[in-house]
Regions:
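A conserved FAD-binding loop/helix module that cradles the flavin
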Residues: 202-220
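A glycine-rich dinucleotide-binding beta-alpha-beta segment and adjacent secondary-structure elements
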Residues: 90-93, 117-202
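C-terminal catalytic lobe of FAD-dependent flavoproteins
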Residues: 49-142
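Short conserved micro-motifs at the rims of enzyme active sites and ligand-binding pockets
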Residues: 13-17, 30-36, 101-108, 180-183, ...
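Mid-to-C-terminal "cap/lid" subdomains and adjacent gly/pro-rich loops that border
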Residues: 1-85, 225-246
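Internal hydrophobic alpha-helix adjacent to the cofactor/substrate pocket in enzyme cavities
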Residues: 137-147, 216-230
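Short, glycine-/Ser/Thr-/acidic-enriched flexible segments
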Residues: 7-12, 26, 97-100, 176-178, ...
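Flexible loop/turn segments at secondary-structure boundaries
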Residues: 1, 11, 100-104, 155-162, ...
């Protein structure tokens, strides 16, 4: 889930003069919050945010947003002005280790084109509101005199925004229960591997860059040298030049 806090124009510091992701906290055992900046050229990202909105449904959350606009018209007007937004904005990136999931389903459009559409897992739905996320944004806004913001999709249609869509290429024993094997090789295809976040089998709850790197290294370690022989499904080498078994 992604929220934002925009500090006042007279704030003394340029928030982009720092490492993009520099600090994080665990407000509870399942939740990890990072502060992020987009950099000087990220002003257009302001169109993805609006005033902070609380919990609700697809019906009540837009009404709550309307109420926020009526109560805070000046703050709302400021969120509509993109110039300098990125320099003055802290992104609040909220991640959890809870076992929830969404699915991507093909949907046929009237034009005949096919597009992918997300669908909630009925048994493990992805949360559309995380109380501690709003609390963190409100706390940061209070400390800086800034404006706390929800993502536009969250406020208007009760759909959260994520930076890390994980999974999709399931690790399995064979093509009946997975896409790739334990070495991340795609079943039924030669020399095709999945080395990105699609192969991550669980919700890691933190920025997954290092996990992706580790998986990629694992997959590469199973590829034999050009002059080696592949020994079974494990991808280990039977011998190398100058030391082959006779």
């Amino acid at each position: 889930m992604i929220l934002a806090v925009t500090v006042p124009e007279d704030y003394p510091d340029d928030l982009t003069r720092r490492v993009a992701i520099s600090s994080s906290i665990y407000p509870d055992p399942h939740t990890h919050i990072e502060t992020v900046t987009y950099g000087h050229a990220g002003d257009s990202m302001s169109t993805l945010y609006t005033l902070l909105v609380g919990d609700g449904t697809r019906v009540t959350r837009p009404l709550k947003l309307l109420g926020q606009i009526v109560r805070h018209p000046v703050k709302f007007a400021k969120t509509l002005w993109p110039q300098g937004w990125s320099r003055r904005t802290i992104i609040v990136l909220v991640m959890q280790t809870l076992d929830n999931a969404i699915a991507l389903r093909p949907k046929l459009k009237r034009s005949g084109a096919v597009r992918l559409q997300t669908e909630q897992d009925p048994e493990r739905p992805n949360p559309t509101f995380i109380p501690v996320a709003n609390e963190a944004a409100e706390w940061l806004a209070k400390r800086t005199g800034g404006i706390a913001q929800s993502s536009l999709t969250e406020a208007l249609i009760n759909v959260p925004t994520t930076a890390h869509i994980l999974g999709g290429a399931v690790i399995g024993h064979d093509s009946e229960d997975g896409v790739v094997d334990s070495c991340q090789r795609v079943f039924g295809y030669e020399n095709l591997l999945v080395c990105d976040r699609a192969a991550i089998p669980a919700n890691v709850g933190v920025n997954p860059s290092l996990t992706i790197t580790a998986l990629a290294e694992h997959a590469m370690s199973k590829i034999p040298a050009k002059d080696a022989q592949v020994n079974g499904a494990s991808g280990s080498t039977a011998g190398r030049a100058g030391s082959r078994a006779s």
